[in-house]
Amino acid sequence: HVFTNYNFKNAFEKKTFGKEIVSFAANANKKEVTFWNEFRPVPLTSEETTNYLKKDSIQTIRKSQVYLDSIDAKGNKFNFLKIITGYSYKNTHKKWSFNYQGVTNIGSGSFNTVQGYNLDSGFSFRKWNDETGKYTSISSTFNYGFSEDRLRVNGRYYHRFNNINNAYISVGGGSAISQFNPNEPISPMLNTIATLFFKNNYMKLYNKEFAEINYGQEVVNGIFASGKLLYENRRALLNTTAYTLVKNDDLYFSNDPLQPFNSASVPFDKHDIFK
């Protein structure tokens, strides 16, 4: 079709155009065929009709429970080795998944002079809704230090309400071991190598029992606001091991960065913080 005799407007009022570039009406992609036949300005060609029918059939199959279950079954296979390496189970049709981290993933094991060798693992459960954008996750993390002989456990709940303003709430708590610098600039792997092979125990750690709640959302287009309430009970820790793979007369520094040569020194007293 060729269109001619366009009518162009030479000028528009100042408020004719807003910041909105494009918008979609709710359920715009859920209309029946009769709706499109009534409002479509140009009828579909036979080729277009055939193409849409083919794509609709493929989409129907790929969204069917039989098809989705068959795809999930390949990734959901379990064997006893996965108890060590980790395991994931997914139900795409019902939109949920479960994950176990295992204990042999990269980063799950490390070494520091406070805990000695330590392992991380955990579980997580996710539930989502593609139509509304809702998303919920529940996760837990376990950390055990062999020289320290202590297990630390913490958990977190996260819920996103929609994908319009991406409003979310997050609640967490438990016990954890943390670096003095909250940004945790020293990676566990780097510290493990530096400690075991060069006796440079850079990472300084403390224990925290904590509870926190976070909320955030997009308040206006492009501007996101969030808030956080946090409680922590902080306690200083001491080195519990002098183990190393390098045999020499060098000694480890203490876990107090202010008095590195005093192994019994603690950098701060036990205290609580709210922020």
Please annotate each region the language model reported.
Residues 126, 141-145, 172-176, 212, ...:
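Outer-membrane beta-barrel pore domains and translocons
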